[in-house]
Amino acid sequence: MSDHPLKEMSDNNRSPPLPEPLSSRYKLYESELSSPTWPSSSQDTHPALPLLEMPEEKDLRSSDEDSHIVKIEKPNERSKRRESELPRRASAGRGAFSLFQAVSYLTGDMKECKNWLKDKPLVLQFLDWVLRGAAQVMFVNNPLSGLIIFIGLLIQNPWWTIAGALGTVVSTLAALALSQDRSAIASGLHGYNGMLVGLLVAVFSEKLDYYWWLLFPVTFASMACPVISSALSTVFAKWDLPVFTLPFNIALTLYLAATGHYNLFFPTTLVKPASSAPNITWSEIEMPLLLQTIPVGVGQVYGCDNPWTGGVILVALFISSPLICLHAAIGSIVGLLAALTVATPFETIYTGLWSYNCVLSCVAIGGMFYVLTWQTHLLALVCALFCAYTGAALSNMMAVVGVPPGTWAFCLSTLTFLLLTSNNPGIHKLPLSKVTYPEANRIYFLTAKRSDEQKPPNGGGGEQSHGGGQRKAEEGSETVFPRRKSVFHIEWSSIRRRSKVFGKSEHQERQTKEPLPYLYRKPTVELLDLNTMEESSEIKVETNTTRTTWIQSSMIAGGKRVSKALSYITGEMKECGEGLKDKSPVFQFLDWVLRGTSQVMFVNNPLSGILIVLGLFVQNPWWAISGCLGTIMSTLTALILSQDKSAIAAGLHGYNGVLVGLLMAVFSDKGNYYWWLLLPVIVMSMTCPILSSALSTVFSKWDLPVFTLPFNIAVTLYLAATGHYNLFFPTKLLQPAVTTPNITWSDVQVPLLLRAIPVGIGQVYGCDNPWTGGIFLVALFVSSPLICLHAAIGSTIGMLAALSIATPFDSIYFGLCGFNSTLACIAIGGMFYVITWQTHLLAIACALFAAYLGAALANMLSVFGLPPCTWPFCLSALTFLLLTTNNPGIYKLPLSKVTYPEANRIYFLSQEKNRRASMITKYQAYDVS
């Protein structure tokens, strides 16, 4: 940049302007404002972070933007100053441009090098592709960075370097043989997975260095990477997602699982799960080794634990993109801190095994696939933290089968965050075809934004719109600015009640674009269609007044009052929501939290939420506190992420949080009122809206709800990351069955079996108190008797299914076989299908399937020391919702129309009535013609 602004500032300080009268200064200032040389660029709503300014970015900046100092001077003085400084500015500009042009040959993606090699021998081009592939592991498309990374690998271990280079070469050649996209090959996108495969196969080999036979599996595994990459990109293209290092993870996991530690030809390093609590003395922690962990964590992306190798890799990143280097270091620090929060052994932290996944996640979110703003910078930190705990969970789970975690944690967590949908303008995801490196990504975003702002709003000429804008500015008294709405402001008239669905599905968009062929007004009746009965009664009263009696009229009036009173507390309590829209945000937020508490059971009713919270306090006040905190944090996070306001108001971003808080308290081995437990409750509850948004983006392709999948993912990751032997947050020890249960059928107690019905309903919230289950049944009945009925039926089905496979009686009495069947029976029996006798039978079948699936998953997950949670319900209900049939009695509702079973059936009957009327009209018109 030119140094002219600094010189101008110094001149002003040395010779201050003479004092002038206030009137003359006002006229001069007014003339400056009307001058055509006044900067007319609009302000950026996303202020640029301090970036390395590239030559192409300098071209975007106007000369007036170089200085933020406004100097008031006369026009003749301005012209003289410009004439005298024009040669000096031109020479300084040429010098600065030549410097940046020289730097641009080495930084960024070195596009000039790629263009120069186009007409050179293929050997040189192939070498460029291999070097770019080595650097693409860290999202860097720069051959110089790749060369430096190879130097760092040689410092670590020359044998590993040979294996990694062979993997890159073979993977790139396989992509050429398969005729993959040439531009992707030239960018190294088909080489980086082979690089990692070669390196990690050598790292995990139990043989000594230079075991040349190992190059055979390296060759074959690397050749599979382009095939897997092409297949995954075909699937991920539907959501415009990258494949990351998934091909490497698949190939490496298959190789290590196929060989193992006891293979004669290719033995691998033995990986075993933790079997005892680690011995940690906090006074023995060494700060120099902790600081050394930062470059070591970066080096562990390539499987290297040498701090000098990590430092060399950081230099390679800085050459291409300082922002990538910065976020890599930040990600390594976040992983280090996350490891300390769960009392990880110091040796594991020092080797950087907690950091490398965080490095990749922080780089990917912090400016690579999202435009870098302060919002996405914070999002990158959250993603790195989530990735650290996910990595710990996957490491413990995969250690059971003797396989290392690879970079699965990075892939799964980053893909989840890339699927996030938000209305926040500061979170902008780039199209995959426009992704280069963070600095260029931000320049592209600012350029596109500036061009959009300069476009005339009504399609007129640019000068006309500019002139119109000046006239509007002059007529300031007549300008009306839109009133800003609070984050708590909800247009209740536009809310469509939905259950377990987030965002706007494709089906809903089609309905808004293509209206139905018949008119439909959403019925305002509640439950048993009492208002329709009243209207018919009024007609009879008007037509047959002479035959009515005073008793009948009084009964009708009483029925009206009862119906109106019931409508205030049953169903969705829409009147409560509409009455709160102009009240304090605190009352609105309380309504959302209560609705979120009841949405676990598909109920959108704050009164039911109050009863459920009361039942939780009857069970255990500590559990109730933890669950309420989870609901609050999950709802607040959804507000911060600018999720759909109607979904937040319906409690659809709170129910996963309440389950997370409850089950973390239930499975804690520290007992009640262990207040430190609230910290992981807060963290894991905050991830629920992110997981919900990501899953809804995927499931919207099939118009499916996300159910309690976010809760299942969050709790499973937490329990797997901590485990029974964790010092800070130990969980209950779960072990698989190793002996045949001793069951005597004469010992079965029928009263306890009957009590298992309400207990099974209470176990949806992790409660085994029958009184709590009874209160939950009352809460369900208040909102919808049909939901209450199917909940009881589902719990009964689960109990009978458990008896049919000789489940130990204690498990049946505690309701552990009934809660998944309860949720599945409600979901199919009138919630997402219209209630008919066919769907009623389908709900019973789904409940039975969920019970047996629950037993299967309980046995499988117990091997990893994990509970089944509500995985069986989610998998079975989603399976039955994907069912297609020509049976007219099985009608699946669009997600945008789902409310509660009684209203769902009223909607369906009104649609059928209108459809039949339209068919009769068409038939009559055809008959007349």
UniProtKB/Swiss-Prot annotation:
Reading the lineage from the top rank, the first entry is: Eukaryota
Record-level Gene Ontology MF annotations: cell adhesion molecule binding; urea transmembrane transporter activity
**InterPro entries registered for this protein in UniProt:** Ammonium/urea_transptr (IPR029020), Urea_transporter (IPR004937)
- What are the transmembrane regions? 133-155, 162-179, 184-204, 212-232, 241-261, 310-330, 349-371, 378-399, 400-420, 609-629, 647-667, 675-695, 704-724, 773-793, 812-832, 841-861, 863-883
Residue ranges of the region described as Disordered: 1-89, 451-480
What are the record's GO terms for cellular component?
apical plasma membrane; basolateral plasma membrane; plasma membrane
Alphabetically sorted, this entry's keywords are: Cell membrane, Glycoprotein, Membrane, Phosphoprotein, Transmembrane, Transmembrane helix, Transport
The name of this protein is Urea transporter 2
